[in-house]
Amino acid sequence: MTSKKRKTLLDADDDNDNFDEDDSGSDFDDDEDPDQIEVPGGGRDLNTAVTYAQNIRSGVGVAPKGGIPIPISGAKIVVGNNKIKPISLLRINNNNNNIVTSVNNRNNNNIISTNGSSNNNNNSINNNSQIIKTTTVTTTPTTVGATPTVGGVALGGKLTVIPIAGRNVALDNNLSNMPKKLNNMVTAMGSPAARSSGNAGTTGSSQGGAIGSTSSYLNSLTTNELMNLAAYVAAKGSNAPPPPPPSTAANSVRHSPTGGIPNPGGNFFGGSAAASTSASAANFNMAASLLAQMSYAGGASQIRALKVAGNIGGVGNNQKPPPIATTPGSGGPAGGAPGSGVKGNNSMMEAVQKLIAMNPEYLTSGIPNTVFQMFMQSMQRPQATPSPNQPMNPGAMVTSAAAAAAHASAVAYVQQEEDEVDYEEMGVAETYADYWPAKLKLGKKHPDAVVETASLSSVEPCDVYYKLSLPLETINSGHLSALQLESITYASQAHDHLLPDGSRAGFLIGDGAGVGKGRTIAGIIYENYLKGRKKALWISVSNDLKYDAERDLSDIGATRIEVHALNKFKYAKISSDVNNNCKRGVIFSTYSALIGESNNKTGKYRSRFRQLLQWCGEDFEGLIIFDECHKAKNLCPVGSGKPTKTGQTVLELQQKLPKARVVYASATGASEPKNMAYMVRLGLWGQGTAFGNFNDFITAVERRGVGAMEIVAMDMKLRGMYIARQLSFKGVSFKIEEVPLSKEFRKIYDQSVELWVEAMQKFTEAAELIDAESRMKKTMWGQFWSSHQRFFKYLCIAAKVNHAVLVARESIKYGKCVVIGLQSTGEARTLDQLERDDGELTDFVSTAKGVFQSFVERHFPAPDRNRINRILGLYDETPSLSSVADSTSSLSNNSNITTAAGKRKGSNNNDNRSTKIKKKKRSGSWECSDSEDENTDMKRNRKRDGGNSNSDSDEANSDDDLKSDIDDEDEDHDVDSDQRSVASDASSDFNPFFSGSDSDIDPWVNARSKKSKKAQKKSKKKVKKEKTKKEITTSSATDPSGSTAMSATVVAALNAVKNRKSQLSTQDKIQDLLQKKQELKGTVTPVGVNGVKLNYGPPPKDAIERACTMKEELLRKIERLGARLPPNTLDQLIDELGGPDNVAEMTGRRGRVVQTDDGSIQYESRTESDVPLETLNITEKQRFMDGEKDVAIISEAASSGISLQSDRRVFNQRRRVHITLELPWSADRAIQQFGRTHRSNQVNAPEYIFLISDLAGERRFASTVAKRLESLGALTHGDRRATETRDLSQFNIDNKYGRQALETVMRTIMGYESPLVPPPTDYSGEFFKDIAGALVGVGIIVNSESHPGVLSLDKDYNNISKFLNRILGCPVDLQNRLFKYFTDTMTAIIQQAKRGGRFDLGILDLGAAGENVTRVRLIRFVRKHATGVAPTEMHTVRVERGMIWQEAIDKYADLFNENEGFYLSHQLRNQKRTAIMVVILESRNSSSTSSTTDLDSGSKKKKTHSKKEIMCQIYRPNTGLQVRHESLFELEKKYRKVASEEAEPHWTEQYDASVNTCSHAYWNGNCRNVSLGNDCEVGLRQRLYHVLAGSVLSVWGRVEHILNTRSNSKMQVIRMKTTEGEKIVGTLIPKSCFEPLVADLRSDSEKQEEFNY
């Protein structure tokens, strides 16, 4: 008899790899590469599987290699010289003493006959055997001794079909082991059961030959060939004819030279009575699996119709069930009555229909073994002892099966029970830890709790030797806290070192918003001043911060240090008389002012940069502070962009002053490695470092995954050049409120989408009609997508305004005050509308409409009719006033503006100041997307222009004031088109279409190469410009419209608007181009204009007319839509919340639209008679802080550095409610925004409210931010943290998995790849086709340049930010479905990475779940680096993670919830059950529904408060507390609650065994890894880890080389805390790499130490 321990015929070792605890739910064996094995429902290419499935259904066999399809009814298995071989593997579970005998039939074909007496214990499935996401068959044993019947294979356990799609690969190592496995069956072959089945002639010796030949034959088959063998068995079923008598041959496999043909319809599989049922079961489960495959590939409409038609069997609803399945009920002595098979099949299919309807995921994943086991048992019960004449009751079977389906579904989860334990056992580190200076015991405690990232907190900073010179009074008074003094000390100490290239080392302050970077910087300046270095440069983002700088210096006692504004200086030597002999102190500059230039090109100091260099001197050793230094990012941009001028200037300043003491200060400075290019003083790359240049550094870091920057940051902290703390968010609460979109809003949104799509078509057509040059088209499309993005963002924000007003009023009613953050003000759109309406407004202006309208007016590729006709000489007409107004922007019609402008001015520089203000008011010809960096560049260029035209301090001041106030446009950048045009010409480095911009087209790509040509024409342009200016002035002065008494201010503003370069907008450029073409009409050769080849003449008049008509038509449609678009968000909020008297507005706009007492709407200036414009925001802030106003509205960039917290020093100490209407999709940026109301020295913490709509993944972004806030200690709506402790990265989409998912989605939509995940089943249309159409409308799918007429993907199709911005332009339903499909794809990609062991979790925490971590050994290598020496350490640690029974009982004693306690698994494996202990956390607060103030939704939440929302912690005997939490609902599918007495033996057994027995061996009886001679630590209580810690950066390349050559694992960063309290963070080193790496590190270290513990 066969041993009960043996599992299967073909795999007796370890089939239960689906229970591997380290494979994250993998469906693959340990040594199988998931990329090499294609699996139904899980593989990428299902074509082969689908074809195979369809052929089986239609009665056609699958053609083997080079063969032709064969009808199944006459299918044959022929060996020998025949080429046709079966294509599937039959894995037969021998758990119930079945015997496989191979004999030879008269036709010399193989016979695989399974005979055996099956017992009645209905052991229908062997729990120790497993499949690979395959078809599983459980047999239905019948009465012992039943007479043999037709066809089939008698099995006591399960038949497993392994469909491997279309690839000639070996199936794992199993094929090579087949001879051994088959030979193991020799003894069984001689059993009486075998002989009684008609194989008595087979002797013992012949059995050996039989097995040898059979194994040889099977081993020679490819996996595809093996696959069809099982298909054939299933196809024959129990209705096949009886087997032929066996031949008397010594071998069961005889090779026929002629390849004999079997009898038509003959059965080649003999079997017992049980075989009928067995084959039926095989047929059934194969049918279910194949249906799943076909559904997955979209090739089976019958699956889709499953729930409706109630017929799962046919290809069409009217077809009969397939012939491949028969019923278990047909197995009588004679094979059942005729026709019973069809009835049974119908019943079986009906039952499986219900099962799949209840569990639709089976369509893609297949039906799990355990579900099938339960299902089959329920199908068998009605016919346990069937009477031969008893009619079948299909209805009873169906009902029984359906009733069992729920329980079967529950059991399905058992397989996954242990899957992810070891994968996530280390978990994700708590992101932050409380902070206190480690090595400096100086000063008083910081007034608020401060935290540090987990990785940095594990690294001790270098020793302190620097002695501060600050007065004791400053230190002891607490004006500088202990952690600020620590920063000052380390910065000063770092400045003592020189880098290998001779320049002085710098220091990076990475403190978050609100910690007090400003005062820290003031302390560093004071320290250097006391050391005799009296000069310092402080470069920041806003002029308003100059006042904060003066305040900070004053607060710490440095009253003697003066702060000078760079923009106040004239363009002359700073230390000269004209600049008041400024020879010491701090020069405060913005990044914009830093790159300013004078219009006077002959002066020696015509640029601010030269002024500063002269003032500092060549040997300058003083301070240069780059505050908010992330504004200098994009020095090394990606894609087609160019380095920003800001970044280049910051770099050049450091190069020119190599001995200067540089301090970088930015909360986000080191978060993005590519934004560190200007941080050349940190010694991370360059001479004497591991990286020769920045590109080497960036390549190395980005290749190493999520934890790479943490390693860099830790290394910098170790070297004493970096410090980063954040304010704890303890006490802060936040809630997410979902604002439902009304049907009306959705309708307006979708209509807007349609109009933008139409606009794109018109722009494309018109550009072709007027023969626009390529550079012009690039500019135009850059503007198009910029406006497109802002339009829809305005629309999204406007949808939430009413809800925000309600929340704000409610908060004020309860004694709180409100802060509302906006990204932009939309002022330029308001001014445009004022100009159109002659200053007479009837309602609030729609910003969204204004964006669209202004864009079309300025950039539609169609010229002004009159002007172009005059240019082309078609007819001559005196230009109408309107045409002049089009180009001159008729400002004179607005008396309100005149009054407002006049009111603002009170000094003799009125005209100049109003000039600049009016420049600001023009809307942007160069408007770009919402990004801070572009805001910086815009400001820079405005400054550049200002510098060109101003030489006195007041004028320069005006311009810089303009810059700071234009921050109101924040990331909207509604700035003057003229100004930015001038800027773009003045500096070819300005690139408004880059730096986070959604715009992908860069009109400045070749600007540098064209510079010389522009210079040659400069003198001609100047003459033309002067002439134009005179004409404009005259036109304005003699305006016949009635404006005869314009103020000098408005006239000056009007002239200033027109004082610009000749090419201003697309329309102007077109007219310029057409004029040139007209001049060239009739020329023989094309002439280059601005580097572009021109055609011989202008386009025909009708083409121009058509373009003009399209523009007018588009503007009419915009006007109609605009009547329904929402008004300006800022104006509406102010109006609804009590008007300007109750709302403090801190933006940069100069005017606003208000509703007067009589209900009329008018535009008024924000300026007040007693408040200068430059201090207006500061005054407004003070009114809010003094409690005069209850609401503050801030525009994000304008409020940079502003403090609105409930400060102990101010009167208004009420709690702040910070309402966010637009969440950035970066959690880092969101935290920066929250720094306005959450800062040091506050009385109470703020409350954040995120308003989200169901558009474009807003809910997911809110989840990202919520997770980050939670990790910082914030509370979800006042409750303690209750969400799953999962990796934050699962919410983050801007990472390599997100980019990979986006690429996959786009390629799937285009049909380049098969879908990784199926499209939504509830979508009525053609999903991919409809999505593709929508993406064409938003420019992600474009007309191919190389193959016109062919659609292709845009070059930046895999840019995440661009994708998120663009899909806003899709209809609401489609954009949500597309985003959902994208996130589903990303999840699938992450799961693939997990299965392959390639998933990068970031930093993992060893010991976070309470394990004991003990250090066993330490080897320390002391190595040199750029600024000194630092240790590199190799730690060996032992982790004990088990939980003894007594500890579990102690924990159990503290539990009180009825659902808490011990649980046992439903499933029995290897005669063992899993014991766990469950501790209830509490109900999960779903981020999408929690914390609404709506009473209705509150009641809904109570109703849905079910077991699915109750989250549980799980403790296991061998691995302790699990990182992954599960819901009670999921747990009860897999486990049942038991008393502690019942759980104890199971608990202690696993605990004791796990000290040296891995989970595979424990649950399966053996482990493949161990049998192959390898170590297996899966599920072990104790583990050894090797961790490389300390200064790793300098040896990182060598580490990676060894890891790559000896192990295919990635570099995993882990953190641990030993039982002795030692913190260790470093890179996990695989055992195979330990010895070679230690040897390598020994080879060149300066000093070595080794310690054993």
Curated annotation (Swiss-Prot):
List the GO terms this entry assigns under cellular component, sorted alphabetically: nucleus
Q: Where is the composition biased (Polar residues)?
A: 194-205, 980-998
What terms describe the molecular function in GO for this protein?
A: chromatin DNA binding; histone binding
Principal location class: nucleus
The UniProt entry's GO biological process terms, in alphabetical order, are: imaginal disc-derived wing margin morphogenesis; Notch signaling pathway; photoreceptor cell development; positive regulation of Notch signaling pathway; positive regulation of transcription by RNA polymerase II; regulation of DNA-templated transcription; wing disc dorsal/ventral pattern formation
Return the Basic residues bias intervals.
Answer: 1008-1027
Q: Which UniProt keyword terms apply here?
A: Coiled coil, Notch signaling pathway, Nucleus, Phosphoprotein
Q: Does the keyword GTP-binding apply?
A: no
Where found, per UniProt? Answer: Nucleus
InterPro entries this protein is in?
P-loop_NTPase, SBNO_Helicase_C_dom, SNO, SNO_AAA
Question: Spans of biased composition, class Acidic residues?
Answer: 11-36, 966-975
- As recorded in UniProt, coiled-coil segments are 1064-1125
Keyword Phosphoprotein carried by entry:
yes
Q: What SUPFAM superfamilies does the annotation carry?
A: P-loop containing nucleoside triphosphate hydrolases
| Protein purpose | Notch pathway component, may contribute to the specificity between lateral and inductive Notch signaling pathways in the wing disk. Required during many developmental stages including oogenesis, embryogenesis and imaginal development of the eye, wing and leg. Ebi and sno regulate EGFR-dependent Delta transcription in the developing eye, by antagonizing a repressor function of Suppressor of Hairless (Su(H)). They are required in the R-cells for normal cone cell development.
Subunit relationships: Interacts with vg for function in the wing disk. Interacts with Su(H) for function in the eye disk.
Query: Which PANTHER family does the annotation name?
Result: PROTEIN STRAWBERRY NOTCH-RELATED (PTHR12706:SF30), STRAWBERRY NOTCH-RELATED (PTHR12706)
The protein's name is Protein strawberry notch
